[in-house]
Amino acid sequence: MAKKSMVVKNQRPAKFSTQAYTRCERCGRPHSVYRKFKLCRICLRELAYKGQLPGVKKASW
């Protein structure tokens, strides 16, 4: 889990556009966040397996 102080800090608008970065909206993780879903890879995987993300299915080839 992310530090609460960092999550709160990220909610404020950045002073400059280059300072802004993405965080997972579910857990607050700063790395490997998918912009389309605003979720980190771990949360994305959990919700996809539960079937809670419409249009997402497991790939097989």
Curated annotation (Swiss-Prot):
Cysteines joined through disulfide linkages: none
Gene3D superfamilies assigned to the protein according to its UniProt record, in alphabetical order = 30s Ribosomal Protein S14, Chain N (4.10.830.10)
Its keywords, alphabetically, are: Metal-binding, Ribonucleoprotein, Ribosomal protein, RNA-binding, rRNA-binding, Zinc
Name the needed cofactors. Zn(2+)
GO cellular component annotations, sorted alphabetically? small ribosomal subunit
Q: Which InterPro entries match?
A: Ribosomal_uS14 (IPR001209), Ribosomal_uS14_bact (IPR023053), Ribosomal_uS14_CS (IPR018271), Ribosomal_uS14_sf (IPR043140)
Q: Which GO terms describe its molecular function?
A: rRNA binding; structural constituent of ribosome; zinc ion binding
Positions binding Zn(2+) in this chain are C24, C27, C40, C43
Q: How is the cofactor bound?
A: Binds 1 zinc ion per subunit.
Q: Pfam families this protein is in?
A: Ribosomal_S14
One Gene Ontology biological process: translation
Q: What does this protein do?
A: Binds 16S rRNA, required for the assembly of 30S particles and may also be responsible for determining the conformation of the 16S rRNA at the A site.
Record text on subunit structure and interactions:
Part of the 30S ribosomal subunit. Contacts proteins S3 and S10.
Q: Which family does it belong to?
A: Belongs to the universal ribosomal protein uS14 family. Zinc-binding uS14 subfamily.
- The name on file for this protein is Small ribosomal subunit protein uS14
- Organism field: Lactococcus lactis subsp. cremoris (strain MG1363)
